[in-house]
Amino acid sequence: MEVNVLNIKGEDTGRKVTLNESIFGIEPNDHAIYLDVKQFMANQRQGTHKSKERSEISGSTRKLGRQKGGGGARRGDINSPVLVGGARVFGPKPRDYWFKLNKKVKTLARKSALSYKAQENAIIIVEDFTFEAPKTKDFVSMVNNLKIADKKLLLVLPEANKNVYLSARNIERANVAIASALNTYNVLNAETLVVTENSLKAIENILS
């Protein structure tokens, strides 16, 4: 699949790049995508949730009534989970939600996500660029020139670029990622991928 290379003014440079079929042209595997996104979302959780159980709450431990002969059900103390205002049973405890996912599955998931974007013609290749200073105006101008101002976009750079990152930081529908940290969730969460030429080479090197 060939894609025209544009500059940040939205103009065609006259060059084309070929998207690697083994990365951008595979049959997407939805289950691999599900597992990778599930792991990503699980890793975002703090896992610090906690509720006090019967032995931890404040309250009297006096038995409410005699064991037998009262005519009603047996009663312990007022902390009993059976009673209104009593303790929580099997409440949440701090835990780590991380789970293992094989590298092959993660790679397949990223390839599947990129293939979906290629099928939707939602990948724009731009020549490598940088901003002389962090200016939101410059980033907005680029987005307008590429005619994607109404899209949620992910800009993929070959390496961290402070000026570009700061220029995009205040744009609600824009995110910036480096090629080596590209993940399935970010790819799928964006409506359009804007990938620089060197980023494309880096992605192909990583996923080949």
UniProtKB/Swiss-Prot annotation:
It comes from the Bacteria. Residues 44-79 are annotated as: Disordered. One of the primary rRNA binding proteins, this protein initially binds near the 5'-end of the 23S rRNA. It is important during the early stages of 50S assembly. It makes multiple contacts with different domains of the 23S rRNA in the assembled 50S subunit and ribosome. Forms part of the polypeptide exit tunnel. InterPro entries: Ribosomal_uL4, Ribosomal_uL4-like, Ribosomal_uL4_dom_sf. Belongs to the universal ribosomal protein uL4 family. Disulfide bonds: none annotated. Keywords: Ribonucleoprotein, Ribosomal protein, RNA-binding, rRNA-binding. This is Large ribosomal subunit protein uL4. The gene is rplD. GO terms for biological process: translation. It comes from Phocaeicola vulgatus (strain ATCC 8482 / DSM 1447 / JCM 5826 / CCUG 4940 / NBRC 14291 / NCTC 11154). The keyword Nucleotide-binding does not apply. Part of the 50S ribosomal subunit. One of its GO terms (molecular function) is structural constituent of ribosome. Pfam families: Ribosomal_L4 (PF00573). GO terms for cellular component: ribonucleoprotein complex; ribosome.
